Amino acid sequence: MSGGVRVEKSGPVTTVIMNRPEARNAVNGPAAAGLYAAFDEFDKDDSAAVAVLWGDNGTFCAGADLKAIGTPDSNPVHRTGPGPMGPSRMVLSKPVIAAVSGYAVAGGLELAIWCDMRVVEEDAVMGVFCRRWGVPLIDGGTVRLPRLVGHSRAMDMILTGRGVDSAEAYAMGLANRVVPKGEARQRAEELAAELAALPQQCMRSDRLSTLHQWGLPEADAMDFELSLIHI
């Protein structure tokens, strides 16, 4: 892969790695394209069951690379196609786990909450830091965050732009696991291997139904749930 993105595979687990240390893994246009391509390839790979998204060099992702604005490497912003951060509009058929170390802020937070689960290091910080610079959330932050943590907690984070530590993130449901510093990738890959060992068709159907039910009347959501089962 290119654009500061690389992919490593271990059996059924695919790890997608953001590697732009000079920008704290902030995502520019080429990095967004690299992330999109990596997850597109993962979803099409029959040998891959679960993915992990991790930021190298001690930081998950500092958001979009604001220094790229106005240059050929700026993030594309369109209402259709890939999201500005890359995969944020993709609905994959298989789970993705975010392995969060350091900072997952602004667009980096949006990437983390695009994932199905989040394994967060004890000293990590998550937040809508783009509030400080007058930059809006455009990769699903205003949609997914309230679904994860509730309207009131999401509004607190979105309006204030304050940082949330791992303990608070776990208490509000933003973090699924809290692990020692330096262990996010390893622990996320171990969790991914556990998921990969489970019967896949049933797990993927239940995951899809859980994603699809938002906004549907209960009866329609339950009908869709049943429609995924081969009777």
Each language-model region and where it sits:
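C-terminal long alpha-helix characteristic of the crotonase
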Residues: 21, 119-124, 175-227
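Acidic, divalent-metal-coordinating active-site segment for phosphoryl/phosphodiester hydrolysis
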Residues: 162-168
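CoA-thioester-processing core
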Residues: 85-93, 99, 105-159, 172, ...
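Conserved small/polar residues in nucleotide/adenosyl-binding loops
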Residues: 230-231
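Hydrophobic/aromatic residues within transmembrane alpha-helices
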Residues: 16, 53, 65, 111-113, ...
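An acidic, glycine-rich surface segment that forms the CoA-thioester-binding/catalytic face
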Residues: 32-36, 40, 44, 50, ...
